[in-house]
Amino acid sequence: MRRVLRSCISILLVLLLFLQTGVIFARAESERPSSKELQSVATAILERKKAEHGATPTDLFFNASFLQTAGSTAGDWYPFAIGRLALETSTEEYLAVLYDNIEKAYHKDGVLDATKATEYHRMILAILAMGGDPTHVGIDRSIDLLRDGVWNCVDKSGTPSLGKQGVNGYIWGLLAIDSMQYEAPDGAMYTRDMILSEVLSAELPRGGWALSGSVADVDVTAMAIQALAPYRDVRADVKDAIDRALNRLSELQDADGGFSAWGRSNAGSVSQVLIALCTLGIDPFTDARFVKNGSTAYDAMMRFQLQDGGFSDSVGGSYNSRASEQTLCAVTALWRMQNGMRCLYDLRPDDLGETPKVAFSAFDAKSMAETRALPTELTLEHRPTVLRLLYQLSATPDVSGREEAERILLSAKAQIDAIILELERLESEIAAVLYPFDALNLRDYGEVKALYQRYEALSVSNRAFLSDSAAEDLLRAKAQLQTELRATLIGAGCGLVVLCLLLYIVFHIRHRRRAQQLPESDE
């Protein structure tokens, strides 16, 4: 009887253990975000960014304020993610402003950036995601970012500079050329094999990569994996390097599922790891190497989410645009993997029969009406519209009234360029005159007053495009110096009154003494 009882108890315990295990698996599976949930996280990040640029939920994402950042880190990763999320939005104005900013950089320095090749690579990816062509940029389509940023990347002296940023330049160069499987042109300074070899040769002895030193850096290791992923199944040395890197990342993962850089858990590092795992097709929710104490990297990333939908770079921290954009890219990578689409940086069409995006639509009767309706006095709010119309015009061979449209649009562009130049100069001169702020004195009053007069000469709309810090500091400096001047004038006035009183007293005393010294007259 006892034996039967013990057997029953044993069977019951096994069943309970089995059921408990089943509950654990169900809970873990239930924590996997759905495609819709991932889209909601991404949308919340985008809405937070819109609010930062003064847009309401019903406004377009690409308003004039945001488009002023096109060509910067903050201005390119959001459009890239929007494109990779396949969100319906107008891309023409972003491409037009970005192309114009690139042309301005080339006209000024002859290059996009003389020291950072990764500037080219980021813009290449953003342009592709938005439906543009990074090999034909500009009104005359003469700028080739692949040529100048990868194949023949040199600094102003003509020295090869793809590796000037260390392994980072090679990593992002590889991501750029593999985004559409571009082939190196004849006579290229760098080839695909050369770049790949540079990345592999930078691997650390224990696995992984770093910009410097001998300790693997989570972000750089994750990005290297992203770049090497396309070669994993065709080259054994690449597969081995990736496997070592994955093991290293697993070792570096924090106990709560997150990842740290410089001893601090942060959103950027965990985002890069998630992108790397998705690029390899590794499920971050079930792969035991990347689940610590029941927490996944995704769980850790979501701890940085704020109530307004944005993300901080440290738990309990404030909103951080860089952390938000990296999280947005990670969420996009997860969304694409869950939907069976190409990985984040593979920008070839998901459907081979898909109609390619057209960067700029035709300049038609509606475009002509828009052109003729432009006001005489323009502001930077009109810049995206003017540039879009110009690029539409350049992309359309036969346009009725082309000369009229060109005259109006080129004149409008010249007016807008003059505003941009004045804002850039004003910003630069404010920095030169006002800082260090504590050293300001009345000798600077004339310069500060002149700067303020230029600020006042701007339209209210254009003033909004001056950085908040420059505008605030200019107003503060003016108020501070006016207060000092007022105090000085009051002090001088009081001093003058005192002096006049003293002179009056002295004169009066001397007058009385003279009167006392005069002899009395005889009568």
Feature-to-residue mapping (PLM):
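Bacterial N-terminal signal peptides
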Residues: 11-20
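Sec-dependent signal peptide cleavage junction
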Residues: 19-33, 509-510
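Terminal, non-catalytic domain-edge segments
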Residues: 27-47, 297-300, 315-362, 500-504, ...
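Long, well-ordered core segments of solenoidal/helical folds
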Residues: 34-62, 90-112, 137-160, 188-210, ...
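Short, tandemly repeated low-complexity microdomains enriched for cysteine and small residues
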Residues: 91-96, 136-143, 186, 192, ...
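Beta-rich interaction/scaffold domains
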Residues: 355-496, 500-516
